[in-house]
Amino acid sequence: MTGSTFPTDPVALARDLLRCQSVTPADGGAQALLAGVLEGMGFETFHLPFGPADVPTPNLYARLGKGHPALCFAGHTDVVPPGEGWAHDPFAAVIEGDRLYGRGIADMKGGVACFVAAVARRLEQGPLKGSVSLLITGDEEGPAHFGTKPVIEWLAERGELPDFCVLGEPTNPQALGDVIKIGRRGSMNAVVTVHGTQGHVAYPHLADNPVHRLLAAFSELTARELDAGSEWFDPSSLQVTSIDVGNGATNIIPGSAVGRLNIRFNDLHTGAALTAWIEDVVRRHAPQADVQVSISGEAFLTQPGDAVTCLSEAVRSVTGRTPRLDTGGGTSDARFISQYCEVAEFGLVGATMHKRDENVELGTLEDLTRIYLAFMEGYGL
């Protein structure tokens, strides 16, 4: 393979990916396109559909080399629906001025293109000293049941886990180089259904008001300060998101009440411990209550070490900024990867992600490519 065949231009690849209408759960040809590019660079590729046989979730894993250090780039090709009112066709990959427009350019087809271009530039210098892989899912913007989680489990079963993973989420709020994510809070939702006895409001002694029991339980839950934060995390937060009784009458005590809450928790807690606490409080106020808990991810932290330092130095060398190490924001697929290897997140500027006219500056695509290349070189590849 000659150097001229390597896809070193991130803009060209990003535009090709943007033209694939991969609104989750559809793929739109994005992963086949990417697989073809990677195979042309010498990667071994695996198409890994998971989920229902009639509508499987597309996933792509590609690896070049077998040695160590073993670096993985994780990302996704699915995008959220574009909505209405765009100035340009959201799948036309229009360049206007110094910006590239398209659904998913920031989150995160642009990041995928930059990493591929960085690997291409590294290969122009000679063979890798270790191995590089890509884990690309089509189920990040959806339920995330059949994407990164089963793929990383598949890698573990094969004994093919990386030493370190970079997730290319758009971590930067305003400018490239703002933030590297080294952890994320855990997230859990609880649905509490309290059953009472329906009755007339004039005869409360003949009824059992479930709303009062639910409010008492939620008052105790919200009164507790979960923690004051930890070294890398802000304080955990419990928020009541709804209380529903379905009662349109003014003179009826309802027979049941349903409350919902969410907890974003730091590394001082586990989902299991918080679940036990919620159940204990609720059942003291409403012994017959039904509590259903869904934990979408545990809190995790990658302690700053050699790899994170190397990534930070790569960012600084290209942008002149020293990125802030951060754990804020919502959940990401890093919650699945962190159970198997160290992971940090760094990608493009996310100011327009999920918005109408999503776009990035063309220069940031080149700069992110240079950052990924500098990181690979510093990491020993």
Curated annotation (Swiss-Prot):
One of its GO terms (biological process) is diaminopimelate biosynthetic process. Pfam families: M20_dimer (PF07687), Peptidase_M20 (PF01546). Its cofactor is Zn(2+); Co(2+). The keyword Amino-acid biosynthesis applies. InterPro entries: ArgE/DapE_CS (IPR001261), Bact_exopeptidase_dim_dom (IPR036264), DapE_proteobac (IPR005941), Peptidase_M20 (IPR002933), Peptidase_M20_dimer (IPR011650), Peptidase_M20A (IPR050072). Pathway: Amino-acid biosynthesis; L-lysine biosynthesis via DAP pathway; LL-2,6-diaminopimelate from (S)-tetrahydrodipicolinate (succinylase route): step 3/3. The keyword Hydrolase applies. Binds 2 Zn(2+) or Co(2+) ions per subunit. It catalyses: N-succinyl-(2S,6S)-2,6-diaminopimelate + H2O = (2S,6S)-2,6-diaminopimelate + succinate. Zn(2+) 1 binds at H76, D107, E169. One of its GO terms (molecular function) is acetylornithine deacetylase activity. Keywords: Amino-acid biosynthesis, Cobalt, Diaminopimelate biosynthesis, Hydrolase, Lysine biosynthesis, Metal-binding, Zinc. It comes from the Bacteria. It is an enzyme of class 3 (hydrolase). Its EC number is 3.5.1.18. The active site is at D78, E140. Gene3D superfamilies: Zn peptidases (3.40.630.10). Catalyzes the hydrolysis of N-succinyl-L,L-diaminopimelic acid (SDAP), forming succinate and LL-2,6-diaminopimelate (DAP), an intermediate involved in the bacterial biosynthesis of lysine and meso-diaminopimelic acid, an essential component of bacterial cell walls. HAMAP family: DapE. Belongs to the peptidase M20A family. DapE subfamily. Homodimer. This is Succinyl-diaminopimelate desuccinylase. The gene is dapE.
